[in-house]
């Protein structure tokens, strides 16, 4: 792990790096929201851009939003997409070039219709659409069961997007649930984004990929088990899984516990480069 210096370095010399802009829950102000950069060689991806992300980038990390070239959104809650309108307008009017976005056709349609068009559809030059602001990088579906997995590459970064259970209107039905995905990065890093406690999903991924490190959603207080994995639930996982698991998306209740005492790798921290060979 490396400490943040003066600005976020969006290049590496061969290593894969994850840099969390924030690690907090949707309502966290002190820890910001759980948004992060994936960085390798000359390529980077900003994973999610919540309401606080542009502020955190500029005020905490001295990094302007114009530095962002590639974006991936895991689901349409405000702590994950609330800053996207600012990114889009900056790309159109300041950078004058559209922003690359990794997104399926399904999510592209619903994201524009239900979340973005209210602030982005109308301009002084007439009506605009999704493709006026973004260049879609469409991932390829590589698996249907036990859950959908999509894959793409951004430069030297391989990304697999797997469907997750986050907000489910019908238990165990992804078709009747809000779109949400987690990520497998270079076949060795697992990032769940927001996800319910689903040990069967974890076990399947761990059996099929050589996962070195896990960054897992964690509701420390435990009041949102219907949509987030709770700390209590995660504590029931086998020791070999917990030992490589960092917890993120936590709230202020995290100040009262030390997860290493329960066998976890710890809480993920904002402003730290997590480096992997």
Enumerate the language-model features and the residues they cover.
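Core dinuclear metal-dependent hydrolase active-site scaffold
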Residues: 1-60, 138-200, 270-277
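Acidic/polar short surface loop at catalytic or gating sites that assists cofactor/ion binding
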Residues: 98-143
């Amino acid at each position: 792990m490396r400490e943040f210096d003066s600005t976020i370095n969006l290049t590496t010399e061969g290593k894969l790096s994850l840099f969390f802009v924030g690690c907090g829950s949707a309502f966290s102000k002190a820890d910001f929201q759980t948004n992060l950069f994936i960085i390798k060689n000359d390529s980077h991806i900003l994973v999610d851009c919540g309401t606080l992300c542009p502020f955190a980038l500029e005020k905490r990390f001295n990094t302007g939003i114009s530095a962002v070239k590639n974006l991936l959104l895991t689901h349409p809650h405000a702590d994950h997409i609330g800053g996207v309108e600012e990114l889009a307008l900056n790309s159109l009017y300041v950078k004058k070039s559209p922003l690359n976005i990794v997104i399926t056709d399904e999510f592209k349609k619903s994201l524009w219709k239900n979340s973005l068009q209210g602030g982005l559809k109308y301009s002084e030059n007439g009506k605009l659409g999704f493709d006026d602001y973004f260049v879609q990088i469409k991932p390829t579906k590589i698996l249907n069961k036990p859950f959908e997995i999509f894959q793409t590459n951004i430069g030297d970064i391989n990304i697999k997007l797997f469907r997750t259970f986050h907000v489910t209107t019908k238990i165990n039905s992804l078709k009747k649930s809000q779109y949400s995905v987690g990520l497998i990065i270079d076949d060795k890093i697992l990032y769940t984004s927001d996800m319910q406690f689903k040990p069967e999903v974890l076990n399947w991924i761990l059996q099929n990929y050589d996962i070195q490190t896990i960054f897992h959603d964690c509701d420390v207080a435990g009041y949102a088990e219907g949509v987030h994995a709770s700390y209590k639930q995660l504590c029931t996982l086998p020791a070999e899984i917990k030992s490589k698991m960092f917890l993120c998306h936590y709230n202020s209740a995290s100040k009262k516990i030390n997860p290493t005492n329960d066998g976890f790798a710890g809480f993920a921290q904002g402003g730290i480069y997590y480096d992997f060979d």
